Amino acid sequence: QVQLLQPGTELVKPGASVNLSCKASGYTFTSYWMHWIRQRPGQGLEWIGGINPSNGGTNYNEKFKSKATLTVDKSSSATYMQLSTPTSEDSAVYYCARWDYEGDRYFDVWGTGTTVTVSS
């Protein structure tokens, strides 16, 4: 069974960076790009960026280039997204999602989501 597991919640103080995790299982981890998407309350989905687990290559939404850093740990089949200097505007649900680039080219598996609350 393909799964992407994420922590349920993260409470972050403004300006304090946070590292979000996405643990994959049930498939060959290095065969699919992993992307990160967020949804702020009452807003639509925003694509943040993606990472190639096989070589660490990344692709970012210009809006998040100075905000998010994607990394990978092949030994634990996990990807990470560090959010730097978060503000209340970064309070959102953050999802990882697997990209099916060889099939229909869409996000075919989604993580459980991490609710990030930025508050002092």
Swiss-Prot record:
Coiled-coil portions: none
Keywords: Adaptive immunity, Disulfide bond, Immunity, Immunoglobulin
GO molecular function annotation: antigen binding
Region: D segment, residue numbers: 99-105
Family annotation (SMART domains): IG, IGv
Position of the signal peptide: none
Region of interest (J segment), residue spans: 106-120
UniProt-listed GO biological process terms: immunoglobulin mediated immune response
Domain of life: Eukaryota
UniProt region (V segment), positions on chain: 1-98
Family annotation (InterPro entries): Ig-like_dom (IPR007110), Ig-like_dom_sf (IPR036179), Ig-like_fold (IPR013783), Ig_sub (IPR003599), Ig_V-set (IPR013106), IgHV (IPR050199)
Disulphides: C22-C96
GO CC annotation: extracellular region; immunoglobulin complex
Record has Disulfide bond as a keyword: yes
The protein's name in its UniProt record: Ig heavy chain V region AC38 15.3
Organism name: Mus musculus (Mouse)
